[in-house]
Amino acid sequence: VASRGRAATPTLGKAMLNKYARAFFTRVLTPFAAFLIRRGVSPDTVTLIGTAGVMAGALVFYPQGEFFWGTVVITLFVFSDLVDGNMARQLGRSSRWGAFLDSTLDRVADGAIFGGFALWYAGGGDDLVLCAVSIFCLASGQVVSYTKARGESIGLPVAVNGLVERAERLVISLVAAGLAGMHAFGVPGIQYLLPVALWIVAVGSLVTLIQRVVTVRREAAEADAAAAAEENAEENAEQNAAQGSEAAK
């Protein structure tokens, strides 16, 4: 959550809401956040509970093919993204630890969601191709996030968003899963939305990974060239100064 010290990376809860809906839910959740603060609950606790709820929804319901109810549970706990940020603002806190915890648990939640899909297709869904696609979505999502974090850690801006980032990956997958789950209520043909969504996320994640790798390579080359030019300029300046001293003698 940005208010907890993290850079402006959209969390799942914020990604699922436009600015008007966010303003509405901020007003609604502010009293609840204040209540939790009075009870001595910390933003970190809310973050942990939210992640646990997402994991439960994904790893309990999805492997059984209960996509509708699993998505309902996940969506409810997703709003912890808004609650912990609201609490942090009320407390006036913006910590590196909070940013680190949020980012780390985001990866855990992502893994649980796509892991739940993979477990379903490896079991009751009986489709090893879609199981592999789900695992690819899980792995590629982690690597896409890592490329940006690693690039920034070595001083590069990584100035590219990419075709399908975390918010898009999760919104596409969860909306498709929720709708596909309505097949259990008699809606015909809608179960095919989830496989289509997983393929879209897989291809989009691969494109995004390539975009980020290419961007990091270009920025690294530019940074190395700039550093070399600066070093040459310093050497030339030193040589000119030395020659000037010799001439003065």
Segments from the language model and where they lie:
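Hydrophobic, well-structured mid-protein blocks that either form specific transmembrane helices
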Residues: T75, F79-D127
